[in-house]
């Protein structure tokens, strides 16, 4: 998979998911490359892909005839009371955002940026909001009587896929303190994020850091040690 630099600083990218995937997947597309495709048959090999995550967002748009950001707002954020969570930079109060720090950010006046394939990592939120989503996952897709995922979807998020020893559907297992936890980490220019939980005790942790070179493993271990003693 080839890396594309389509970041838009200080604004939301004008390119839609439809335009992005036509440019990447169609042989006539501006960003088409055979390197973006696997030679393996579908459902035979697991290979992590950020573009694959964005493709799920595009599929949601095609099925629902609603943009992915609006679909999430109506079906996840509002039902769960996630009032500080947005895909779009234009809808986000900049004064409430932490400043991202990275040597790879070229424009210090507009350090916040977006990208066309935003479903794979363009969400802006806070720990309190995201904890509501995590609690819903822990509680089989439901929080305070509101169901955002089916139990079968949550089961798939906990189940190893295609022979992998770590990768499930979107989530994966990571070892801390010699113990496996389920969740997802993330990183962009100027940010490092971690969200994991113990599938046996249902203890979960979330950490945000406004530095893209942060090693948070020790903090993760300390938080799990604390949480599991409560």
Model-derived features with residue positions:
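Short, intrinsically disordered/low-complexity patches at protein termini
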Residues: 92-96, 155-156, 205-207, 216, ...
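Short, gly/Ser/Thr-rich active-site loops of penicillin-recognizing serine hydrolases
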Residues: 177, 211-230
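Short, surface-exposed loop or secondary-structure junction motifs
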Residues: 1-189, 193
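Short, well-ordered beta-strand elements
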Residues: 183-184, 192-211
């Amino acid at each position: 998979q080839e890396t594309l630099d389509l970041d838009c600083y200080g604004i939301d990218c004008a390119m839609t998911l439809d335009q992005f995937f036509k440019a990447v997947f169609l042989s006539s597309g501006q960003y088409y490359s055979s390197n973006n495709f696997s030679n393996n048959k579908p459902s035979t090999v697991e290979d992590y892909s950020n573009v694959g995550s964005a493709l799920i967002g595009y599929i949601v748009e095609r099925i629902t005839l609603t943009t992915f950001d609006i679909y999430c707002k109506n079906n996840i954020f509002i039902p769960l009371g996630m009032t500080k969570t947005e895909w779009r930079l234009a809808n986000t109060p900049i004064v409430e955002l932490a400043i991202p720090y990275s040597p790879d950010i070229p424009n210090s006046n507009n350090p916040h940026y977006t990208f066309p394939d935003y479903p794979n990592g363009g969400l802006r939120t806070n720990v309190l909001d995201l904890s509501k989503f995590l609690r819903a996952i822990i509680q089989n897709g439901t929080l305070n009587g509101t169901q955002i995922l089916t139990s079968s979807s949550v089961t798939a998020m906990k189940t190893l896929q295609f022979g992998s020893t770590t990768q499930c559907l979107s989530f994966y297992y990571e070892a801390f303190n010699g113990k496996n936890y389920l969740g997802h980490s993330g990183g962009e220019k100027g940010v490092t994020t971690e969200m994991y939980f113990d599938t046996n005790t249902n203890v979960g942790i979330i950490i945000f850091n406004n530095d893209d070179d942060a090693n948070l493993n020790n903090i993760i271990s300390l938080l799990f040690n604390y949480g599991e003693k409560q």
